[in-house]
Curated annotation (Swiss-Prot):
Pfam families: DMRL_synthase (PF00885). GO terms for biological process: riboflavin biosynthetic process. The lineage of its organism: Bacteria, Bacillati, Bacillota, Clostridia, Eubacteriales. Pathway: Cofactor biosynthesis; riboflavin biosynthesis; riboflavin from 2-hydroxy-3-oxobutyl phosphate and 5-amino-6-(D-ribitylamino)uracil: step 1/2. It comes from Clostridium botulinum (strain Eklund 17B / Type B). GO terms for cellular component: cytosol; riboflavin synthase complex. This is 6,7-dimethyl-8-ribityllumazine synthase.
Amino acid sequence: MNIFEGKLIAEGLKVGIIVGRFNEFIGSKLLDGALDGFKRHGVNVEDIDVAWVPGAFEMPLIAKKMAKSPKYDAVICLGAVIKGSTSHYDYVCSEVSKGIANVSLETGKPVMFGVLTTNNIEQAIERAGTKAGNKGYECAVGAIEMANLIKEL
């Protein structure tokens, strides 16, 4: 029996990070967490590219562009969609999550979903590093593991 597990050593990996500008104060905290995660695991700052997009809905297009490039081993998408009083939230969350998943399946590269989908601002703040960890950091570690696992298989 063979067992494969992605290593958490990131030296030599090149990564793309996409951050939504909408709810930027949350996106910035998620970005800080992701950068910390990549640096702690050995990614050189020069091997990290950050692309800012208007909001979560625009992420799948840029994720596809990055993932199709041989330059990147992994891509992470970071941002926050916070529920309001209309159904807009449901449409955005659904399309963004499907779009990001499709990019990963189409390109064969890990594209991590670090878009917080919360009922209120307090939940978003908690998941951006104040109480419940930092989803950006978690996505960075997940991207490292998946990129290495793909190389191993």
